[in-house]
UniProtKB/Swiss-Prot annotation:
HAMAP family: PSII_PsbN. One of its GO terms (biological process) is photosynthesis. GO terms for cellular component: plasma membrane-derived thylakoid membrane. It is found in: Cellular thylakoid membrane. It comes from the Bacteria. Keywords: Membrane, Thylakoid, Transmembrane, Transmembrane helix. This is Protein PsbN. It comes from Prochlorococcus marinus (strain MIT 9211).
């Protein structure tokens, strides 16, 4: 990557970080760790 500009490298790094955080969020929302999450709307008495 010696011929590419610093701006392109920075843009790729930011893109990879954002995709990683998005993947982590989806994994935490729907993966095995989601079994322990509670829905406060289900526990609320009307």
């Amino acid at each position: 990557m010696e011929t590419s500009s610093l701006a392109l490298q920075l843009a790729i790094i930011v893109l990879v970080v954002l995709l990683g955080l998005t993947g982590l969020g989806v994994y935490m929302a729907f993966g095995p760790a989601a079994k322990g999450l509670d829905d406060p709307w289900d526990e609320h008495d009307d």
